[in-house]
């Protein structure tokens, strides 16, 4: 015991960026950066999370707004279109001048819109001569976009072309139908980018009104990581916050109601059939997340060796990949299982997947499966804060979902302490094999029986998966 404690102390005392020997690593997780998260609020009400990281002369800034498609109201696609238009124009600069402005400083601007959130991000060198002009331009783009009319037409056309492309993609069609069935009239039901009908009618006035409301400082979380002092970080956060519209945080959407279980088929002329199975999962505040995350890792969250992959691909050759995932969101996000298989084997494959889920819920994981999943988690966990980019993403999520600052460490400790019974209980509390909403997309063809399981399946998945 004392020996182990001494070894642990010597490892802990050594800086995290020094090399570890292979002997030291044997059976243990690699060392990971301990995050010293500093936090405060700006005068306008934005929440700020900051980690000082001096290794490289650069910094990452990520501003997260509760401005995703769940805030679209009756206008699907409004949030996505607003976000896409941010860097299309500011006073005195069009989209090309903005891009050249960032590029000339060696800076990267990024933006994105999802169901819960919209994001604007900046990566820049930290020297004052590069940092200050990059931040000035970023503050204008995020806080004072001009929404030029010609750009709106161009981006609408790009989105409309995307919708046309989606019609040729059975996976996209199935995914859209699945969210519609799973969420009904809830704001999560419609696609983040809206539809051809809704996008066409969106006006500049609607974009400006949405930006003024949803891109307000009170509705923002500012995450900063990099080569900055606390004083510099405070100045950056104050500058960004002051440049945003004034206003409060927007309310989260209501919790969704449980959907009606059942199967919907979309007829599509393809060789393969897409199978999507889902039910409502959890929100990001749910205390069962560590148990569900580990339980899902064993079911279908990893690559080879999961219950689903072993039975469906390795023993029967029915698919290239079958995956399950919980997506916790502001309110209950989906639990999903996705795969593609030969059209003539689709009904049998669907039943097999349902049986695997039912059996897993009934029996729970084995001790060996749980131990392996814990070891895999411990090995991959350091990657969650190995780079500034990954840290700034974690900070953004912690701030946006109002998680404890120790959330990453807590998650790891709670996961490693879980028992087989706790994982089984959590999976059964949140999932039920007979409550699945199922969407399939593919041709109607005569069905064949599934091959028997074997170590060397004679069936091979068809070609490259269709997307």
Map each language-model feature to its residues.
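Non-catalytic accessory/assembly modules
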Residues: 5-9, 150, 380
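Generic structural signal for individual residues within well-ordered alpha-helical segments
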Residues: 99, 153, 200, 208, ...
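His/Glu-rich zincin catalytic helix
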Residues: 1-108, 121-126, 132, 136, ...
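Short conserved segment of the HATPase_c
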Residues: 167
């Amino acid at each position: 015991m004392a020996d182990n404690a001494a070894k642990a102390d010597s490892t802990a005392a050594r800086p995290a960026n020094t090399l570890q020997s292979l002997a030291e690593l044997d059976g243990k997780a690699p060392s990971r950066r301990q995050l010293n998260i500093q936090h405060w609020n700006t005068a306008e009400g934005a929440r700020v999370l900051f980690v000082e990281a001096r290794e490289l002369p650069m910094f990452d800034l990520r501003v997260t707004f509760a401005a995703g498609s769940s805030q679209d109201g009756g206008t699907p696609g409004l949030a996505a279109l607003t976000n896409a238009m941010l860097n299309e124009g500011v006073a005195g600069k069009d989209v090309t001048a903005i891009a050249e402005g960032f590029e000339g400083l060696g800076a990267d601007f990024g933006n994105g819109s999802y169901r819960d959130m919209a994001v604007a991000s900046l990566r820049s060198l930290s020297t004052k001569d590069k940092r200050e002009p990059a931040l000035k331009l970023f503050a204008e783009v995020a806080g004072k976009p001009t929404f030029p009319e010609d750009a709106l037409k161009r981006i609408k056309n790009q989105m409309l072309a995307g919708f046309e492309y989606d019609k040729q993609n059975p996976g996209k069609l199935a995914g859209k139908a699945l969210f519609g069935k799973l969420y009904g009239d809830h704001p999560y039901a419609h696609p983040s980018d809206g539809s051809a009908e809704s996008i066409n009618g969106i006006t500049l006035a609607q974009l400006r009104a949405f930006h003024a409301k949803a891109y307000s400082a009170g509705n923002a979380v500012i995450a900063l990581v990099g080569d900055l002092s606390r004083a510099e970080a405070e100045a950056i956060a104050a500058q960004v916050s002051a440049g945003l519209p004034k206003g409060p945080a927007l309310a989260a959407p209501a919790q969704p109601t449980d959907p009606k279980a059942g199967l919907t088929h979309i007829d599509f002329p393809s060789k393969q059939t897409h199978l999507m199975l889902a039910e409502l999962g959890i929100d990001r505040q749910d205390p069962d997340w560590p148990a569900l995350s580990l339980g899902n890792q064993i079911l279908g969250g990893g690559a080879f060796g999961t219950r689903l992959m072993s039975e469906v691909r390795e023993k029967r050759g029915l698919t290239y990949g079958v995956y399950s995932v919980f997506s916790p969101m502001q309110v209950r996000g989906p639990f999903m299982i996705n795969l593609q298989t030969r059209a003539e084997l689709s009904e049998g494959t669907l039943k097999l997947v349902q049986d695997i889920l039912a059996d897993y819920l009934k029996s729970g994981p084995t001790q060996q499966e749980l131990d392996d999943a814990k070891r895999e988690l411990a090995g991959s966990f350091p990657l969650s804060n190995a780079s500034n980019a990954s840290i700034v993403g974690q900070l953004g999520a912690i701030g946006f979902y109002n998680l404890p600052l120790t959330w990453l460490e807590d998650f790891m400790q709670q996961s490693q302490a879980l028992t087989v019974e706790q994982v089984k209980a959590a999976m059964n509390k949140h999932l039920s094999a007979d409550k699945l909403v199922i969407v399939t997309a593919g041709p109607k063809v005569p069905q064949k029986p599934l091959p028997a399981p074997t170590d060397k399946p004679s069936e091979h998945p068809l070609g490259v998966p269709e997307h």
